[in-house]
Structures are given as C-alpha cells and as structure tokens.
C-alpha cells in the first residue's frame, strides 16, 4: 500500500515522502496513529502543491536575505554605538548582540533578531569591529560596528 508520511517515522520515511509499506502496517499502525495517510491521487496532488509553495517561499526568503546582505555590506553601512570607556580604550561593560540589533533597527530600519548576530563574545573595546550576521542558512553578511566614546 502506498502512503504519504505526515511525520518522520524512524527507519520508514520522512515527512512528505510517498512510500510503499505493507498493508497491515499502514492500516493498523501508520494511519491509525496519524503518522501517514493513504496515497490517493487527490492526496498526491495536494502534497505536490504544498511542496511547490514551500519551495517558492524558501526561494523568496533566500532572495530577501540576499537583499538585506547587500544593504548591510554596503561601504556606508556602519552601525554607530556610544559607550563609556577608560583611558586605554576598553569599555566599562560591553556591547552585546541585542544592543547591535537595536542600533541597526534605529539607524538603518533593518530589523534583525539578536540571535542572528553571531558575536562570539561581547565587544569590549573602542573602534571598528566586523560582526558576522547569519541572515539565512545559506547567507551570511558582515556588518561594521563602530564603538565611540560617550
């Protein structure tokens, strides 16, 4: 019997996959537990339409991430932050990714989740720092952060 998997089933199939399985296994376990449904023509067509729309949405997200990358990596894009510092150029405290995300939204109207800013450790010195930003699993940008004394 052909079934469409609704969830991942270990050792049998992944979500959205169409596979042949024994009739008893399909009816008594997979379909009964809601892990799969029978692969009728209508169900297969619905699945293909869903996969097509998912692919289009993923392509749109990728294009949007690339557009944001061009804005962030432009030469004139420098995120300015002010902080108190000592005489040796070290900050009193630090600048975390949340503060960078807030400044980016204020200065360039680019809203980013602070978790996308891959700051290995908070910035603790004055000057310019290149900070990687993971916009999409396939797109990573670098933004320049300039920390000046208050």
From Swiss-Prot:
Keyword presence, rRNA-binding: yes
Pfam family for this entry, one: Ribosomal_L9_N
Claim: Nucleotidyltransferase is one of the keywords in the record: no
InterPro entries: Ribosomal_bL9, Ribosomal_bL9/RNase_H1_N, Ribosomal_bL9_bac/chp, Ribosomal_bL9_C, Ribosomal_bL9_C_sf, Ribosomal_bL9_N, Ribosomal_bL9_N_sf
Keywords tagged on the record: Ribonucleoprotein, Ribosomal protein, RNA-binding, rRNA-binding
Gene3D superfamilies: Ribosomal protein L9, C-terminal domain, Ribosomal protein L9, N-terminal domain
Any single GO CC term annotated in Swiss-Prot or TrEMBL for this entry: ribonucleoprotein complex
Any one Gene Ontology molecular-function term assigned to this protein's record: rRNA binding
A biological process from GO: translation
Function: Binds to the 23S rRNA.
Family membership: Belongs to the bacterial ribosomal protein bL9 family.
Protein name: Large ribosomal subunit protein bL9
Organism: Lactiplantibacillus plantarum (strain ATCC BAA-793 / NCIMB 8826 / WCFS1)
